[in-house]
Amino acid sequence: MKVLGISGSLRKDSHNTSLLRAAGELLPPGAELDLVGIGDLPLYDEDADTDPAPDAVARFRDAVASADAIVVSTPEYNASIPGPLKNAIDWASRPFEANPFRGKPVLVVGASTGLFGAVWAQAEIRKVLDHIGANVLDTELPVGQAHEAVAHGLRDAGISAELERQLAVLVAMTRDAEAVGHRSHRERERVAA
C-alpha cells in the first residue's frame, strides 16, 4: 500500500517533515510512505491551469492520484493553514471532476513549536479536504513543542503510540475503501439522497 506524505512546511529542517518520516517507520506491515515536495508548485492561477498542466503541478497531481492513502502534516502560521499547503491542495483539486483527493483516505497531523501543536491548522485543513471530497479521519494529533518532540526523531512515547494507532486506522480504512470502492462520506450522502 502506497501512503503519500505531504508536509505543509518548506523548511529544510521541518518538524512536520520529521513527523512524516517517523510516521513512515510506524506504518503497519505492507504499507510504505513516500514524501512529495510542494515547494516547486507555482501559486495557483486559473489562467495557468492549462492542459497540459505545468510540470510541477502534473507531478504533484500524479503523486496524489497514485497514492492509496495520504498523511498531511501541517505547521500552523497565524492560527491557520500555511500558504504552500493550501496552494498544493488548490492545484490538485482542480478541475473538480478530476480531483485525485476525492474519496482518498487522509490522516491530518501537525507539529508546531507552540504548546497547541497546530490544532487550528489541522481543523482548517480537515475542513478543506472534506470539502473537496477526501475521506478524512476525524482525529487530530497535535505535536506541541516540536523542536523538542520531533527535531531528532520522534522521542515522545505517547505521541508515537497515538501516531501508530492513527496510522493503523488509516491503513484499515484504506483497505476497507478499496474493498467497497473509494467514496467519501459526502459521495455516500449524495448517493443515498
Describe every region a protein language model picked out.
Residues 52-132:
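Helix-loop-strand module that forms the ligand-binding subsite of alpha/beta enzymes
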Residues 4, 135-193:
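Glycine-rich phosphate/pyrophosphate-binding loop and the adjoining helix
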Residues 38-54, 149-152:
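N-terminal beta-loop-helix "entrance" segment that forms/cooperates
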Residues 1-30:
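N-terminal beta1-alpha1 ligand-phosphate binding loop
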Residues 3, 16, 20, 57, ...:
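A general structural signal for well-ordered alpha-helical segments in protein cores
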Residues 27-34, 134:
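A generic structural motif
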